[in-house]
C-alpha cells in the first residue's frame, strides 16, 4: 500500500462492516462465538469496505489460530471524537509481551519466532492490516486484556480530510 490515494473510500455504516466480517468469519470458524457491539446511532465511516472487512476477518482469524484457547471474539465499534474505534478482543491466551512491540513489523527474529510458538505467519498478515489502516488515515495497536486474551484496536477518521484541509488547519 503506497498511500491513501490508492484507497477508494465511500461512507459506509460501521456496524454493517462488523456484521459482514463476522458472518464471513463464522463460515470458517462456526465453533467460535462472535459478539458484536456498536453504537445505537448510525456511524458512517469513509472506508474501502472490502479492505476494512478483510482487516477484521484477519484479526479474528489470528485470534483463533494464535490464541490457542479462543472460544469467543468480541467486535466492538465506538466513537472517540472524530475517530471510529474498532476493537477485536478474544478470550485466548493473549500475546507474548516480548512480541507486542514488533507485532506489526511483518517479520519476527528467531528468538521472537521461538516465543511466538509457530506464529511466523501472524506478523505478515498484521503488517498488511496495519498498512491498510494507515492508508485510510488510521492507526493500529495491540495489547493484552487484564482479564486475559488479546485486544487489537484500530482507528479510522470519521471525516475525509485532504492534504489541503490539513494545511489550512495547521497554524503558521
Where are these regions (language model features)?
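Acidic ATP/Mg2+-coordinating residue in the GHKL
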Residues: 90
Amino acid at each position: 500500500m503506497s498511500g491513501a490515494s490508492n484507497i477508494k473510500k465511500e461512507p459506509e455504516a460501521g456496524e454493517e462492516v462488523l456484521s459482514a466480517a463476522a458472518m464471513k468469519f463464522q463460515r470458517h470458524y462456526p465453533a467460535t462465538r462472535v459478539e458484536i457491539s456498536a453504537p445505537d446511532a448510525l456511524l458512517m465511516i469513509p472506508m474501502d469496505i472490502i479492505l476494512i472487512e478483510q482487516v477484521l476477518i484477519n484479526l479474528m482469524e489470528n485470534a483463533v489460530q494464535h490464541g490457542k484457547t479462543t472460544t469467543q471474539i468480541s467486535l466492538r465499534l465506538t466513537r472517540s471524537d472524530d475517530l471510529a474505534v474498532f476493537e477485536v478482543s478474544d478470550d485466548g491466551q493473549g500475546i507474548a509481551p516480548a512480541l507486542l512491540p514488533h507485532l506489526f513489523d511483518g517479520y519476527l527474529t528467531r528468538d521472537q519466532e521461538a516465543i511466538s510458538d509457530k506464529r511466523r505467519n501472524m506478523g505478515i498478515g498484521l503488517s498488511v492490516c496495519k498498512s491498510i489502516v494507515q492508508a485510510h488515515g488510521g492507526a493500529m495497536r495491540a495489547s493484552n486484556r487484564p482479564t486475559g486474551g488479546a485486544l487489537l484496536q484500530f482507528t479510522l477518521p470519521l471525516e475525509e480530510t485532504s492534504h489541503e484541509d490539513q494545511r489550512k488547519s495547521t497554524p503558521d
